[in-house]
Regions:
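Conserved ABC ATPase signature
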Residues: 1-2, 6
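Conserved signature/switch motifs of ABC ATPase nucleotide-binding domains
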Residues: 18, 49
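Catalytic Walker B motif of ABC-type/P-loop ATPase nucleotide-binding domains
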Residues: 23-26
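Conserved H-loop
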Residues: 51-56
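A short, surface-exposed alpha-helical micro-motif characterized by mixed small hydrophobic
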Residues: 63-65
Length: 102
């Protein structure tokens, strides 16, 4: 029987078999334990060298560890997009600032 993390890795591997240009992942580490989540994050860090990866997540800590660029959406509207460092350090839009405050 496969663990949640193993199932998630298998799903990602299966998606890669068709050699996509973009890999879209929706909450790839949700419902996984810390160890499995760390393995998925490491896999994604390695894959982003070869693929364009779009991750939809509410997990800001995870986004900080993985993302090169960030697009912030609120109520279905694109609010702000920046390289990750600038996004976390100097957001411009008030909605982004409020969201990042928690």
């Amino acid at each position: 029987k496969l663990s949640g993390g193993q199932k998630q890795c298998l799903c990602i591997a299966r998606a890669l078999t068709v050699e996509p240009k973009v890999l879209l992942l929706d909450e790839p580490c949700s419902a996984l334990d810390v160890k499995a989540s760390a393995k998925i994050e490491e896999l994604l860090k390695n894959l982003k060298e070869r693929y364009t990866i779009v991750i939809v997540t509410h997990n800001l800590a995870q986004a900080k560890r993985i993302a090169d660029d960030v697009a912030f959406f609120q109520n279905g509207r694109l609010v702000e997009t920046k390289d990750a460092e600038t996004f976390w350090e100097k957001p411009e839009c008030e909605e982004t600032k409020e969201f990042l405050k928690g």
